[in-house]
Design a protein with these regions (language model features):
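Mature N-terminal, pre-catalytic/accessory segment of carbohydrate-active enzymes
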Residues: 1-2, 140-166, 170, 175-189, ...
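Conserved catalytic cores of very large enzyme subunits
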Residues: 1-143, 179-181, 190-193, 197-760
Length: 760
């Protein structure tokens, strides 16, 4: 690592323990000009974006070459943003659980267009459309909002340019004076004008990202290696920069994503409101979230350091060639060396991926960085083409959102909802009522004891899940058009493909693709529970339905022997056992087939199935009663598509084989398997890396979809609990994000330690 990056890293880790100040509460555009109330809401939103760019705090940090600091926010603890809506608009939105913070994020801007054209050209494009639009007031308002919003980037960049110019006069060395002057010059050019150099391209992307993340948009940066490489290549060939300078520039860029991290939970502020989760969570999510945040059992602390900032490298180009380049490798190497948790790094592999990308991936995973997340192009791309109807060129150009969900890069409006299939089983067993509080959680399918065959029981369960899907999709379709009435995204819409051509905000069906992912949640627990019922109740008849339900109602109290039996003697998903895996295959087939029916009926949005919890598995388990697989009431669920915690006993390959028995092209939004591994039985590091590379190739060959690997021994995790300062850079994967282990609450750490430690 270069001397500059070493200093930046040292500064960064010191700042982790300093309180980050929140800014922007109680601001309003009406304080500046009360007459703005007469303007259309989308234009008022754009003016609020300008206000943020004009007034937000700015600073240039020591040694850095890329400048810009987004305002403080986080997925776990909310946002701040100036008021632009009237009282009447706020009241109307609240009736459908929305507010000005109801911006979904999870999208990729089309950065290639920004770099190629610059924002000024996009503003001129919007003006041209406006001039041609005379009889559609809604379209005119949209174009006016984009024309107003995009210059916010120039406002912010100009402020940084002026600050850099001032600091040049205060610089202690000639070298730093020169760097400040270069930064000032670049900030006066990009992102409004096209980028011409590697430094300009990086600063252009970061300035836009800073504006987006300071104005409620939690966006990712997409295929960063594909759009940055031409600038790097040209500068290297023209000898404008050296390899070390390129690493300094890229490293300075990557560090910026981590600058809002806080490792001292006492510094966390809660700015969460009902609107922050209104577009994807269940109705009681805010209440549950706040309760969980203050509960000693779990904390949302890990989400306080999450901003949905993903980048993805390598994989096929739109033309079908391998896209691995020097930036692909350098991104992985630098995030590894700098020991960052942001940006989240993902890598796209396929059957012909070059050895060099596998090598840097395996070395990062072996170090224990819990990154990169591995995507299999040979499953994802055909899945998009066959089952979502996406043209192959756009499918090959897929990216991911802030966690892992796959979507065509720069062209997609995306949303998801949790379909809690374990609650569907609870509903079937308890006549539509929660085991925790008796509240209605589903339909009453009658007395489950009267379902006298496995086939009848399984069919009843699948109907329960379909009912839950119906509710989620009906809500999505019913309330979709409410969002632009309170929370349009004019800045993002201006840099999202097709919005300008259609004359529509992204939230008004402006993007080329609209994907909604109903994500199966609690998969492994549901399938393991169904295996218990099939085997013990219907086949062996050693357990009555009445006794099982009684045990669940009593949270397994008085039935510990039975609980241990179902946990240890009945086959479990994740062990390459066809008995239980076949139940999962049949269930997933029914689930995907039902969504196929919806895709035949609804033509303006596409439903993309997946399996996912993200980092929310404690909260998602908190609302579930005890389950037939032996899980206790309110215990955390397994993450994503992973085996239940501690139930995968036959090694990582067996876990992967269980997960790939279903055709994963049909789970085309994604279904990550999260594994914890250890090299303690391997003779040396190089042998371990070779084994890991072989495992990754096998994962691709077997038809896997998404894989995460955290390489850390149980003993190391326990030692980190005792001496957190010695392990401040220890990272673990939490379903949808990577977190510093020491920042998690102890119960969350303990839950992670319970995960099976697979050896090679």
């Amino acid at each position: 690592m270069t001397e500059r990056l070493t200093r930046i890293k040292d500064r960064l880790f010191q700042e982790y323990y300093e309180k980050k100040e929140w800014w922007g509460d109680n601001l309003s555009i009406f304080d500046d000009d009360p007459s703005l109330v007469e303007k259309p809401l989308p234009v008022r939103k754009a003016l609020a974006v300008q206000k943020v760019a004009r007034e937000m705090p700015i600073e240039i940090k020591d040694h850095e070459l890329i400048v810009g600091v987004p305002t403080m926010s986080s997925v776990g603890f909310g946002h701040t943003f100036p008021r632009y809506e009237t009282d009447e608009e706020a009241e109307a939105a609240a009736k459908v659980s929305l507010n000005r913070k109801s911006v979904w994020g999870h999208h990729n801007p089309y950065y290639q267009k920004i770099l190629d054209k610059g924002l000024n050209a996009i503003v001129e494009e919007a003006k041209s459309f406006l001039d041609k639009t005379s009889d559609d007031e809604e379209k005119r308002t949209f174009y006016e909002s984009v024309i107003t919003a995009l210059p916010a980037a120039e406002i912010l960049a100009s402020r940084y340019g002026a600050l850099a110019e001032y600091l040049a006069g205060e610089a202690e060395t000639e070298e730093r004076e020169r760097e400040f002057k270069v930064m000032a010059q670049i900030c006066r050019k990009v992102p409004m004008e096209p980028a011409e150099t590697f430094h300009e391209a990086l600063q252009s992307v970061w300035t836009v990202h800073t504006i987006l993340h300071s104005t409620l948009n939690y966006t990712s940066i997409g295929r960063v290696d594909q759009y940055l490489y031409p600038y790097y290549k040209k500068d290297i060939e023209n000898e404008l920069i050296t390899e070390d300078v390129a690493r300094d520039l890229l490293g300075s860029f990557l560090v910026k994503f981590n600058e809002r991290v806080q490792l001292n939970n006492e510094h966390i502020e809660n700015h969460f409101t009902f609107g922050d989760w209104s577009q994807g969570g269940d109705p009681d999510l805010e209440t549950t979230h706040l309760k969980m945040s203050n509960d000693e059992a779990y904390t949302y602390g890990q989400s306080s350091n999450h901003w949905l900032q993903n980048c993805i490298v390598s994989g096929y180009t739109p033309e079908g060639e391998d896209g691995t380049n020097k930036i692909s490798l350098m991104v992985i190497e630098l995030v590894n060396e700098l020991e960052l948790i942001d940006p989240l790094v993902s890598v796209r592999l396929h059957k012909d991926s070059p050895e060099e990308i596998l090598d840097v991936t395996a070395r990062f995973l072996a170090k224990g960085g819990a990154q990169p997340t591995v995507f299999n192009d040979d499953t994802v791309v055909p899945g998009m083409v066959k089952h979502l109807g996406i043209p192959v060129e756009d499918a090959r150009d897929y990216s991911n959102d802030g966690c892992w969900e796959t979507l065509p890069y720069g062209r997609t409006e995306f949303g998801y909802g949790h379909i809690e299939v374990l609650l569907s089983l609870e509903s079937l067993l308890n006549r539509g009522k929660s085991l925790l509080n008796g509240n209605e959680i589903g339909s009453d399918s009658g007395d489950p004891a009267e379902l006298d065959t496995w086939e009848k029981f399984f069919d009843a369960y699948k109907r329960q899940v379909r009912d839950r899907l119906d509710v989620a999709i009906d809500n999505k379709l019913t309330y979709y058009d409410e969002v632009p009435k309170i929370a349009p995204v004019p800045f993002l819409s201006g840099i999202m493909e097709d919005c300008l051509a259609k004359g529509r905000d992204m939230t008004q069906r402006g993007a080329r693709y609209r994907l909604y992912a109903p994500l199966i949640t609690g998969f492994s627990h549901a399938i393991d529970s169904l295996a218990v019922i099939k085997k013990l109740v219907f086949e062996e008849k050693s357990l009555t339905m009445e006794r099982l339900i009684s045990a669940l109602k009593n949270n397994w109290g008085g039935e510990e022997q039975l609980r241990q039996y179902v946990m240890n003697k009945v086959p479990k998903y994740g062990n390459d056992d066809d008995y239980v895996d076949s139940i999962g295959v049949e269930f997933l087939d029914d689930y995907c087939s039902y969504l196929d029916e919806y895709n035949q009926k609804v033509d303006w949005i596409t439903f993309a199935p997946g399996v996912g919890t993200f980092e929310n598995y404690p909260r998602l388990g908190y609302v579930c009663g005890a389950s037939p697989d032996g899980r206790l009431a309110q215990a955390a669920l397994a993450s994503n598509y992973s085996p239940s915690v501690g139930m995968d006993h036959n090694g990582p390959t067996a876990a992967v084989k269980s997960s790939t028995k279903f055709d994963l092209e049909r789970l085309n939004d994604g279904c990550p398997v999260d594994l914890r591994m250890s090299f303690k039985h391997v003779d040396n590091e190089e042998e371990g890396i070779d084994i890991l590379k072989s495992f990754l190739r096998s994962y691709v060959r077997l038809g896997g979809n998404i894989l995460t690997v955290t390489t850390v021994e149980t003993e190391t995790l326990k030692e980190a609990q005792k001496k957190p300062k010695d392990y401040e850079s220890l990272r673990v994967r939490l379903g949808g994000l990577t977190a510093y282990f020491v920042q998690l609450a102890k119960p969350q750490q303990d839950e992670y330690i319970k995960r099976t430690e697979h050896g090679f």
